[in-house]
Amino acid sequence: MRIDYHNKEIINKIYTHDAVFKGFDYDYENNLIQFEMVEGYYKKRFKFIFHNVFGFKMASCDFWGKCLRTDTWHTADENEIAEELTEIKEKKRGKSEDGKLLESKSRLNSVEECVESTLYFISGDSLTIACEYIDFEEIRLAE
């Protein structure tokens, strides 16, 4: 299933509670983040691929003790990471010899809206990713 800005509310309806997070892979060259989670009670595997990643942040403090299980996955109403990056982009624009601002060459320019979502863990930690779109797959495991 493809999730983008226009259908991002789907994220709030996907039940990932107690799925075990297996770590993530960030492919810098292709701007991808991918990971899988396995949920034992309902016997499901979840596959996530975040495309055209603009930024991500993670809290990894084990606030309530170490735990790889997830609590929830939610989308944000406001794209904090994208807004922060847009501010940085504007500050970093150079000026031409006549004092005019140069055009930004940022990948942010190529996307109308991005989708930002946060995966919350039982430990109190979180992983927030801002990207163009997400490919999400829910697979039923054999009994």
What is each stretch, according to the model?
Residues M1-E143:
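Surface-exposed, interaction-prone regions used to assemble/regulate multi-protein complexes
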